[in-house]
């Protein structure tokens, strides 16, 4: 119902409010004839997300029916949580904010606005880690083992484009692409494929043998010569993909080169040795490992962080495969698994297995304080579970 200026002045007089103490613009509110509750939802955005929306970018809600929904921008992932408010929030199109009203005292004016909706809660966003554990599992359904091993059936099932992956993985586009690179996924004709590990090691072996026969430096492997020499053995795109996975591209005047990463090659070789053994005598493993890497490369145990764990309490000392990617994504479940495997950990041993759980401003120390308790043993700080394990 509309109100006249005289009615407003009379209301202020009854309320004993001096009009000079107020802005001269008055909003008269009424419910829209088409008003229904539940038509709108509110979402709280930070400045960065607001600017992205204003620039025309999209925000996407992702998740299956069984998943807790997340919201994704182009480069970040957010948890969606409902926050209740003590006051009712009204949606009023056309309502003027104080900074949109004249600062000087003007004659009393009335703006009639309709309430389009209301809510007593809103969606609150909290930055979270993308949920990527499912990604490798999906790609492992149909690994790539070279062109000669591709069958019609492998081309018809379990194949994923970028859009296919974004429809089932709770991650922003940039975070997904970064993880695809980290797990050495290869885009073959628009389809993302994981190379069979034995095939990947075969490619790497071709490259390192060529480097040895040509007496090249690992820090300067010429791309074009490498492709020409190995094209009779494997597709050029596979050779270049392997160089990209295990090296860094350098732009040179004479053509692109790759500087191979010693740590990555030593790490892959260790995985090849450990993947079929339950436990390995540490001394014997280190000897075989060093013999298995290309001449001129040096193996070190710190290259195996997040890949393998050394047991120094056993006699003889042993090493076994334990990959971070095989552990639960949930923080509490991760700690339960680790403490179920080993009762007490040093920070150096456990850090590689919880590093990825840290938020933007969270440290490993803060995580350990929350989920573990510390004690001293022979001058060494050890961590064990803060809660009883079932």
Curated annotation (Swiss-Prot):
Key words of the record: Cell cycle, DNA replication, DNA-binding, Nucleus
Family matches, as InterPro entries: Dcc1
Main location: nucleus
UniProt-recorded Gene Ontology molecular function terms: DNA binding
Similarity comment text for this entry: Belongs to the DCC1 family.
Quaternary structure annotation from Swiss-Prot or TrEMBL: Component of the ctf18-RFC complex which consists of ctf18, ctf8, dscc1 and the RFC complex.
Protein name, entry field: Sister chromatid cohesion protein DCC1
């Amino acid at each position: 119902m509309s109100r006249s200026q005289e009615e407003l002045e009379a209301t202020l007089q009854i309320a004993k409010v001096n009009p000079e103490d107020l802005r001269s613009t008055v909003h008269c509110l009424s419910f829209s004839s088409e008003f229904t509750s539940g038509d709108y939802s509110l979402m709280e955005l930070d400045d960065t997300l607001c600017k992205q929306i204003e620039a025309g970018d999209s925000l996407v809600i992702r998740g299956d029916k069984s998943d807790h929904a997340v919201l994704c921008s182009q480069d970040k992932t957010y948890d969606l949580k409902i926050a209740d408010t003590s006051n009712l929030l009204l949606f009023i199109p056309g309502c003027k904010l104080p900074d949109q009203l004249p600062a000087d005292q003007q004659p009393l004016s009335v703006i009639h606005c309709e309430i389009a909706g209301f809510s007593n809660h809103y969606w609150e966003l909290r930055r979270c880690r993308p949920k990527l554990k499912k990604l490798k599992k999906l790609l492992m359904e149909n690994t790539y083992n070279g062109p000669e091993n591709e069958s019609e059936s492998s081309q018809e099932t379990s194949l994923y484009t970028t859009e296919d992956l974004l429809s089932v993985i709770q991650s922003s586009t940039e975070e997904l692409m970064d993880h695809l690179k980290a797990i050495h996924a290869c885009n073959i004709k628009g389809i993302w494929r994981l190379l069979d590990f034995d095939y990947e090691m075969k490619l790497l072996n071709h490259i390192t043998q060529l480097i040895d026969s040509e007496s090249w430096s690992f820090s300067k492997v010429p791309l074009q010569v490498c492709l020409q020499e190995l094209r009779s053995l494997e597709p050029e795109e596979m050779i270049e993909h392997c160089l990209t996975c295990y090296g860094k591209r350098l732009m040179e005047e004479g053509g692109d080169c790759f500087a191979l990463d010693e740590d990555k090659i030593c790490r892959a070789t260790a995985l090849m040795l450990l993947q079929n053994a339950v436990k390995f005598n540490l001394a014997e493993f280190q000897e075989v490992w060093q013999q298995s890497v290309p001449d001129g490369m040096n193996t070190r145990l710190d290259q195996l962080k997040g890949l393998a764990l050394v047991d120094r309490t056993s006699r003889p000392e042993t090493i076994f495969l334990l990959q971070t990617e095989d552990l639960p994504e949930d923080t509490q479940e991760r700690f339960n698994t680790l403490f179920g495997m080993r009762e007490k950990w040093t920070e150096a041993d456990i850090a590689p297995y919880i590093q990825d759980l840290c938020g933007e401003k969270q440290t490993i120390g803060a995580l350990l304080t929350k989920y573990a308790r510390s004690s001293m043993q022979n001058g060494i700080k050890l961590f064990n579970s803060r809660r009883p394990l079932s």
